[in-house]
Amino acid sequence: MPTNWKDSGLRWYWMVVLVFIADQLSKQWVLANFELRESVELLPFFNFTYLRNYGAAFSFLSDAGGWQRWFFTFVAVGFSTLLTIWLRKQPRQMWRLNLAYTLVIGGALGNLIDRLQHGYVVDFLHFYWNTSHFPAFNIADSAICVGAALIIIDSIITERDDKKKKAQENNNTAKE
């Protein structure tokens, strides 16, 4: 574990702030300029559509009666705390994992503020093709998904590199 926070993954915390600010500013813009369910086509497959999500990703548990607001609040605080602790333990050079953790934290905190302030998450990025629609989402959701993908990619690359090192060590041992 790095002895100084400046040598740890916490050096990447600026990304949390960047994601959080971009997410909150975009949502404030939507709230100021759109009526609920109002939609503006930007491209033949992409709209800004203001929707309220009372659940999680893909509106999971959106009709659960209200308890989910506090459940997802607890989950966001818990994961953000855990990932921040892990960032403190990571060397700052582990950029892929540090970036992944900060993207997830920034997204979780962005949606957390919505839940606490409004009781729902503001979604507005709406992709579709003909009659097939992908559920609307926001910048925080995107950051969480990209962060999760980076965690998976990092684990695959780390496992591959570990296997290469082990094979190299076995080769060197066999030559002696």
UniProtKB/Swiss-Prot annotation:
Membrane topology note: Multi-pass membrane protein
Recorded superkingdom: Bacteria
Known catalytic reactions: Release of signal peptides from bacterial membrane prolipoproteins. Hydrolyzes -Xaa-Yaa-Zaa-|-(S,diacylglyceryl)Cys-, in which Xaa is hydrophobic (preferably Leu), and Yaa (Ala or Ser) and Zaa (Gly or Ala) have small, neutral side chains
GO terms under biological process: proteolysis
Active site feature: D123, D141
Subcellular location: Cell inner membrane
EC numbers, comma separated: 3.4.23.36
Pathway field: Protein modification; lipoprotein biosynthesis (signal peptide cleavage)
UniProt-listed HAMAP family: LspA
NCBIfam families listed in its UniProt record: lspA
Protein name: Lipoprotein signal peptidase
The species this protein was found in: Shewanella woodyi (strain ATCC 51908 / MS32)
Record lineage: Bacteria, Pseudomonadati, Pseudomonadota, Gammaproteobacteria, Alteromonadales
